[in-house]
């Protein structure tokens, strides 16, 4: 038979009858692919050709297959509802409601005053409040006293002296109440004090602050303040200071700002305005906050029945007070006074500062007078920083200049 007549093999059948690749060959091919063998069969990864641990790897694979199968069998054989990870039940967390008020007592070397104010707080008729004492690195027994006798008080101890204003802000930062109340450590509030503050606070939702009636500790018929007022000359005034209390201010509840020695602040306003300006350090920081709150459209209310007795020297002349009042008055005006009112009251403002400076110069030998002049000089030297703050404060005003001007007093 010729070659042409010979039957040709069927390609499909020959492929079917071709011997298949062995399992070992398939494994070798897979290893070569994973190892990246080149076209000549040279392996670029010598570890793949190392059979030192091949038996161990194979044994591990067998063990894992058996373990998986065993787990599956056990799971299928488990009773209905079986859970290999039992659910652990825990008692519900106890929710601690935030108090309505947080009373913050800044303290510096006031161990001799603290028992009076803290015992008075324990005697308050209104009880939904917490007490926070911020100790400003006292060198007396204040911290030891608080830890031993007043464990219910939240104590924050500054590692170094940071100033009164910083302590107020620190306490307010951890306060949980809707009403943030600042109370000096050298005071004694009456048992109804906090209840009266709360009553007025709730009745005046537009009040950023509610301030107390402060009377002298040792002359309890004599006023320290019934609220802060601001003169047309930009100088703050304690309304009623040194006057005998006959209730003459009880009906005049609208004030410019509250005295930080015993005033309640609305939490959201405090946070929105950033609290006290820590650059003030001490003195007039409360008037500065009140000025900013007024510019933002909020009110300040006097609560005449919220009575607090305050240790205050009638003689004055404190060097720190003289310095910081002299400096901070200038900063207060520079930060907050609208431009139109600066122009309108320019003569009164300049005249007021000159009169204070001249009076201090005439008494130059007095330490308090020197401190006042140094404070005024420091106020002028620090104007640049206050003018930067002014550029943030003034565009946010929510009150007309004419309405603000009506709040200023002539004397």
Model-derived features with residue positions:
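Cell-envelope/extracellular polymer assembly enzymes that use nucleotide-activated donors
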Residues: 99-102, 130, 288
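Short aromatic/hydrophobic "clamp" motif used to bind/position activated sugar donors
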Residues: 180
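Glycine-rich, basic loop-to-helix element that forms the pyrophosphate-binding segment
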Residues: 157-175, 185, 196
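Active-site-adjacent helix/loop segment of glycosyltransferases
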Residues: 300-388, 402
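A short, conserved alpha-helix in the catalytic core of glycosyltransferases
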Residues: 254-307
